[in-house]
Amino acid sequence: MRKRSFTLVASTLGLTLVLPSAGNVGAAELQALGGGGIAAPVKELVAQFENASGHRIAFRLGTTPELIKLATTGGPFDLGVVPREVFADPAAQARFALGPAINIARVGLGVAVRSGSPRPDVSTPEALKQTLLKAKSIATLPESAAGAQVLRAFERLGISNEMQAKTKAQKSPAQVVEAVAQGEAELGVFLVNVLTAPGLDVVGSFPKEVQQEIIFAAALAANTKEVDAAKAFIAYLQTPAATAIIKAKGMTPG
């Protein structure tokens, strides 16, 4: 039996996730774009799909601005599973096939602390506001769809100016986790599924009054030459097997 291996290759824009397949004759090699917030489920989803289909998929993961740049200037790709904010950019939207994108997963914002630290109250807008104001520092990822929603939440709470001075901007979801786990930031404020990581304790999701979910949607690239294989992967993402993985990684399918 051939052993499978996983390789993460750093790039100037996010990460490239390469998962080799069994190499069936005639199998497609797909290039895909993905939001960094779905890195954990994507790894398992691709592995399961490859085992069943024989196709190979290489995912380039990044923030929303990075994905827009990848879509418009990063070379050919076959499909994307990206935050819906990517499709709001006209140049990026033009690189995807006509027709509606299909919602695959969604997740809301939350707050985490270093494991073992006191767990502040974030259960109401006022409690969240006071927790954020009392924190000495927070880690988030402003240059992302989730980070933009964090900043909008600060605006709704009326604390934008105060938070600007104590925000330690990170460059990737993994760095948000690391900053809190290493004690470089008191709070992590980002997607709940990303914050659910070793070294962190999630203290709670944002209250519904200020909560905004990030929706990851799938769409074919306009110029893909592997239409059938790309469609097959998107169809697989909607199966019970795939939605079970999505749920297990702290996200809501659809």
Report each predicted region and the residues it spans:
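N-terminal secretory signal peptides that target proteins for export/translocation
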Residues: 1-4
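Exported/periplasmic ABC-transporter solute-binding proteins
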Residues: 26-93, 97-107, 113-254
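General helical structural elements
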Residues: 6-8, 88
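Bacterial N-terminal signal peptides
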Residues: 9-21
